[in-house]
């Protein structure tokens, strides 16, 4: 399947139309950004590792009854996916308090959150992705109450499945963000990606960071080692690809 027209050139991914009106090609680039794109670097093979990690996690979710937009991975950094009408909401699930949560609220760093916090942000760079609530979502026409409830339910199910899967690999899923869209039938399914770019991942023994937070903290030389470590832990040896 060949890529045709560029329809979205994001911070780290490019999306193209294909000869199938119901499918798109998502190209994972080697770009790494922070601070709403204010800081940008290129990390060798980062796009491929993110695509491979996302593919594995999408397959795990599919095996557990959670529909995703994934179709195929013809190249290590190229994903063929179902075309979705994306909902401009980032759904964030937090299992452990850290990051922006402890900066905004009186809660100690490292506090286990039980039940997990589900947060929704407006995906809009020009407004710096402000936090939403149900009333704002409905006022902006982003989703109905029924859809808000569905997004919450799906995000918590994703959290349940991936927390267990990753812990078996010695990784704590601290928090993560996901995006959803509607397919040609109007069904809401998981889209975009799930990778160390959009998750906080800690080693379960040392609590070392294995995600993009390393880049945010200026530890550029440790970033790709962490991404490779995640890949090596979650991909069985017989499925590994030499990059």
Swiss-Prot record:
InterPro entries: SAICAR_synt/ADE2_N, SAICAR_synt_PurC, SAICAR_synth, SAICAR_synthetase, SAICAR_synthetase_CS. Pfam families: SAICAR_synt. This is Phosphoribosylaminoimidazole-succinocarboxamide synthase. GO terms for molecular function: ATP binding; phosphoribosylaminoimidazolesuccinocarboxamide synthase activity. The keyword GTP-binding does not apply. It comes from the Archaea. The gene is purC. It catalyses: 5-amino-1-(5-phospho-D-ribosyl)imidazole-4-carboxylate + L-aspartate + ATP = (2S)-2-[5-amino-1-(5-phospho-beta-D-ribosyl)imidazole-4-carboxamido]succinate + ADP + phosphate + 2 H(+). Its EC number is 6.3.2.6. Pathway: Purine metabolism; IMP biosynthesis via de novo pathway; 5-amino-1-(5-phospho-D-ribosyl)imidazole-4-carboxamide from 5-amino-1-(5-phospho-D-ribosyl)imidazole-4-carboxylate: step 1/2.
């Amino acid at each position: 399947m060949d890529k045709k027209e560029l329809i979205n050139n994001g911070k780290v991914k490019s999306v193209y139309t294909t000869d199938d009106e119901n499918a798109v090609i998502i190209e994972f680039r080697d770009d790494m950004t922070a601070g709403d794109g204010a800081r940008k670097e290129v990390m060798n093979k980062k796009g491929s590792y993110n695509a491979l990690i996302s593919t594995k996690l999408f397959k795990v979710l599919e095996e557990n009854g959670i529909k995703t937009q994934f179709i195929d991975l013809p190249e290590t950094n190229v994903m063929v996916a179902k075309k979705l009408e994306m909902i401009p909401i980032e759904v964030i699930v937090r299992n452990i308090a850290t990051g922006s949560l402890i900066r905004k609220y009186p809660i100690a760093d490292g506090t286990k959150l039980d039940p997990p916090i589900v947060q929704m942000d407006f995906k809009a760079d020009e407004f710096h992705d402000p936090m939403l609530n149900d009333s704002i979502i409905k006022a902006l026409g982003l989703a109905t109450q029924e859809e808000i409830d569905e997004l919450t339910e799906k995000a918590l199910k994703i959290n349940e499945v991936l927390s267990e899967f990753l812990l078996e690999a010695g990784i704590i899923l601290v928090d993560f963000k996901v995006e959803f869209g509607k397919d040609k039938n109007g069904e809401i399914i998981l889209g975009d990606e799930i990778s160390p770019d959009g998750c906080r991942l800690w080693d379960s023994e040392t609590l070392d960071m294995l995600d993009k937070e390393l880049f945010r903290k200026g530890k550029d030389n440790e970033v790709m080692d962490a991404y490779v470590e995640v890949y090596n832990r979650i991909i069985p040896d017989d499925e590994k690809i030499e990059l």
